[in-house]
Amino acid sequence: MSSGRLLLLLGLLTLWAELTPVSGLGRPKFCELPPEPGLCNARKTFFYYSLHSHACQKFIYGGCGGNANKFKTIDECHRTCVG
């Protein structure tokens, strides 16, 4: 393989690596947890990060318990889990 082709291949591989998103990079592990409504009955609208849709979605939170993948606002969810 000529040095010109090798440089072109190296350049294309570098470009591909820069443009390919790395799933979960810098995302807290708790963003992977499913939504948990908790044990109480307050029925508050909260947001969680969904691994299936790769987006923040609404769920009904009972007001106590649950896990760390719960946010009062969609902006807080985006800042924490989407980036």
Curated annotation (Swiss-Prot):
Location of this chain's protein in the cell: Secreted
Keywords: Disulfide bond, Protease inhibitor, Secreted, Serine protease inhibitor, Signal
Cellular component GO terms, alphabetical: extracellular space
Gene3D superfamilies associated with the record: Pancreatic trypsin inhibitor Kunitz domain
Disulphide bonds in the chain: C31-C81, C40-C64, C56-C77
Coiled coil: none
Family membership: Belongs to the venom Kunitz-type family.
Chain's role: Serine protease inhibitor that inhibits chymotrypsin (Ki=3520 nM).
Protein name (Swiss-Prot/TrEMBL): Kunitz-type serine protease inhibitor
Protein's organism: Ophiophagus hannah
